[in-house]
From Swiss-Prot:
Coiled coil: none annotated. It holds the Pfam family BPD_transp_2. Disulfide bonds: none annotated. This is Autoinducer 2 import system permease protein LsrD. It is found in: Cell inner membrane. The complex is composed of two ATP-binding proteins (LsrA), two transmembrane proteins (LsrC and LsrD) and a solute-binding protein (LsrB). Its main location: membrane. The chain crosses the membrane at residues 7-27, 45-65, 70-90, 91-111, 118-138, 162-182, 216-236, 240-260, 261-281, 288-308.
Amino acid sequence: MNPWRRYSWEIALAALLIFEILAFGVINPRLLDINVLLFSTSDFICIGIVALPLTMVIVSGGMDISFGSTIGLCAITLGVLFQLGMPLPLAIIITLLLGAICGLINAGLIIYTGVNPLVITLGTMYLFGGSALLLSGMAGATGYEGIGGFPTAFTDFANISFLGIPMPLIFFLVCCLFFWLLMHRTHMGRNVFLIGQSARVAQYSAIPVNRTLYTVYAMTGCASAIAAVLLVSYFGSARSDLGASFLMPAITAVVLGGANIYGGSGSIMGSALAALLVGFLQQGLQMAGVPNQISSALSGALLIVVVVGRSVSLHRHQILEWYSRRRNAHQA
């Protein structure tokens, strides 16, 4: 297939991203400053980190809406472990394991109950979120400040740059490369696509469906934990509400990136570009003085438009056939 046709959606997203930055740059010229542009990504790049493995979950025919609560639970757990005197490196490792366990819980419940993933992860969203609030209350960190007192080396980590690139953005780029190779260049990635197209056929074809689902959900949980660590470092405090606003932007990024909400197709490159597109949209609106409520409403509207547009695109032949029959009936 012609590369231009194969990556036409990603090319369109890249062009739209450039146009968006230039448009907001006209409103606020500061956004055209390369340093401002790069460092402004630190405010939203964790959404992209979570959106990458979430793409694999959705392509497999699944769904996970609990990652925001997982981020909050991992963040407050990191703070509590540090508060109890645990060495920070060990606390971070345990936090990453906790994120993976949250993902494994999701996968296990989905596989062994057969209940719709949306329903299961809705339940675990409240389970993990409630656990985070309980842990926060027990630690006396119910206020906006959360748990602080982290070493300067840790709090500086998410605010420093390497070769002029902010560290969170470097993490995102590394994650992009990892998940792109995993999804588009390995047998596991091929299995994810096949499961999304038909889990039953994949099962009959001796594809390890359960193992693949456990892996993609665990990676989403682990990515949520990575996002939690970066957010705690960036803000300098561990709070249970970190990640609470990630749900809509992350899902919008995955769907806008080209993933079929019913599974079977999707693109890591598309999700990465869409995450930047959604992030800069929110950032640009904020710099233009638009209230957060309107920004959230626009993100929701964007998600609806994309879902409807993708649905129309997938069923365009049936729509054209129906329109042709209607026109012929009127002419007769």
